[in-house]
Amino acid sequence: MTYEESVKYLYKIAGFAKKSSLEDINYLLEQLGNPHKDLKFVHVAGTNGKGSVCAFLEAVLKEHGKTTAAFTSPHLVKVNERIRLNGQDISDERFKDACNRVKECVEAAVEKGVNQPSFFEMMFLMALCIMEEEQPDICLIETGMGGRYAVSYTHLTLPTI
């Protein structure tokens, strides 16, 4: 898929996907090679200000010579804003490549009975794949999925802080 097709694919999911179970997300992570396993995470949770805290942490970590990756929501202008490397939105090319990787995995899993991941879950999986490729010093993950997986995120991403 092209970048434009990737974005359309993700927005189309938003209309019909049910929230996946933790088992579904874990299965998809396994099929993707457990991209999160060797990364260090800071998990940012709370009612308000998560995106601001992530931006602040990115700046502080950069000032101290650390590389970062961040996954936040929502985006304001372009969906790429949700995944950042060293404070910069990922490129259209990187977005497209991650979407294609996750889409291929998801389509095979759905054929085996796994629920189609939601838009947010797809973005989460894409972010982890990009983080695995980049291997930043610290990954910043904002709580999402309506807070429903706050504890699960902690389990899935094994936060450093």
PLM regions with names:
Residues 22, 29-30, 34-37, 63-153:
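ATP-dependent carboxylate-amine ligase catalytic core
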